[in-house]
A protein has these predicted regions:
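Generic, well-ordered alpha-helical scaffold segments in large soluble proteins
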Residues: 109, 113, 135, 152, ...
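Hydrophobic alpha-helical segments characteristic of transmembrane helices
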Residues: 246, 271-301
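Gly/Ser/Thr-rich loops at beta-strand to alpha-helix junctions
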Residues: 99-100, 280-287, 350-352
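Phosphate/diphosphate-binding loops
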Residues: 196, 203, 208-212, 266-269, ...
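Short, glycine/charge-rich flexible loops or terminal/linker lids adjacent to PRPP-binding catalytic cores
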Residues: 296-343, 352-357
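Alpha-helix capping and helix-loop boundary segments enriched in small/acidic/polar residues
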Residues: 123, 251, 255, 317, ...
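Conserved short alpha-helical segments that host acidic/polar catalytic motifs at enzyme active sites
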Residues: 1-209, 215-275, 280
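Feature captures the catalytic cores and cofactor-binding loops of soluble hydro-lyases/lyases
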Residues: 60, 64, 86, 289, ...
Length: 360
């Protein structure tokens, strides 16, 4: 998973951009980047590896040196971005969120349409964001390019694009990932996570529909590409990926998890009789709270996540490392475990990594 944030302001926007991007750190731990535009300096950009260093620490120096009124940034679990592009459409910076399943097919198509090379490689593959930019630049306008890419991509793709005039943002064709617009006096922003602008004094302004394309500057925004009718948002945003304070399509993540726990409790009524209900941190906690609230079974925390250093266990790229993180990040409270019947709720049981390591 990845996340992005963009802002246009009458004042310098780098502080808002810095913290807005940082609020997406739960969505990725490999790469991060920021790009800004100022009339005096033009485009400037910074990209860093954040696998072993948090975003704020890595980008603190860049944030103090950059300046501009418009900017975009991203946390990426795959390719380095944003990318700076010079083309017949003008100069722009671009960041994407999603997964292109027909990547190789589209690379071949770009070659056939006249592009002779790609510059960016990530893990032996052509950078997906550069691929998107190459496809866009075969058309006569940015909007036409975005629509063209949306029609070709199999998988998911949301786009954020920075120009000297303002920001373009396009939600995935089927709305699989969210895009929210925030607004305050003299500034507007776009974000994957709705809560990312709450502490920056922005207020909820608009949520893009599937395939919708939106343009904004510091003063105003407008839809330039109408939304589609079909919505297939990723349900795992509520179950796992999303931060508890996030809201997608009017449904808050924490509230949804509590209600899921309540539904589990209704299913179990009269069948199980635990001493306490508990969740595997972090995203399992609200499920357990919902279960406890409905059944009146005490909610306890027999496993505590060591939050200062351990990331979410889905983030490492190899399974061995995932297993290690899953094992090391949770510390048991034996007083709350020994001789007790626990009902333990976990949302990550595809591979059984978390639940197996925890219960053993």
């Amino acid at each position: 998973m990845s996340g992005f944030f963009g802002v246009a302001s009458k004042e310098d926007c780098v502080t808002e951009l810095f913290y807005g991007v940082d609020y997406h750190s739960h969505l990725g731990t490999r790469r991060a980047g920021m790009a800004v535009y100022s009339e005096g300096k033009g485009f400037s950009r910074a990209i860093h590896n954040i696998e072993n260093t948090p975003f704020r620490t890595k980008f603190d120096k860049d944030a103090n040196e950059m300046n501009g009124n418009i900017g975009i940034g991203c946390i990426s679990d795959f390719e380095p971005q944003p990318l700076l592009i010079q083309s017949h459409l003008g100069s722009f910076a671009i960041a994407t969120v999603g997964k292109i399943n027909n990547h190789d097919e589209l690379v071949k198509k770009v070659y056939e349409e006249g592009t002779c090379h790609f510059q960016e490689m990530s893990g032996g593959m052509i950078n997906a964001t550069e691929l998107v930019a190459a496809l866009m630049c075969t058309k006569h306008s940015i909007l036409a390019g975005i629509r063209y890419v949306q029609s070709l991509v199999k998988g998911s793709l949301s786009i954020m694009l920075l120009t000297s005039e303002g920001l373009y943002v396009a939600r995935d064709r089927l709305g699989r990932t969210p895009v929210m617009i925030g607004k305050r006096d003299g500034a507007m922003c776009a974000t994957f996570e709705s809560f990312a602008y709450m502490n920056l004094d922005f207020e909820d302004h608009y949520e893009l529909g599937p395939a919708e394309v939106y343009f904004f500057n510091a003063e105003e925004g407008r839809t330039i590409g109408e939304a589609g009718d079909e919505m297939k948002i990723c349900s795992f945003l509520w179950v796992y990926y999303g931060y508890p304070t996030a809201t997608y399509e009017g449904v808050n993540v924490e509230d949804m998890r509590c209600r899921c726990g309540e539904m589990l409790a209704k299913r179990d009524a009269g069948k199980v009789f635990p001493d306490s209900a508990a969740g595997v941190p972090d995203s399992g906690l609200a499920h357990a709270i919902g279960y406890s609230n409905y059944t009146k079974i005490p909610y306890t925390r027999p496993f505590i996540k060591y939050t200062p250093t351990w990331a979410r266990s889905f983030m490492p790229t190899n399974q061995k490392q995932r297993n290690l993180v899953a094992r090391m990040k949770l510390i048991p409270v034996h007083k709350m475990i020994k001789d007790r019947k626990l009902l333990l709720i976990d949302d990550s049981i595809v591979r059984g990594t978390q639940l197996r390591e925890t219960t053993e």
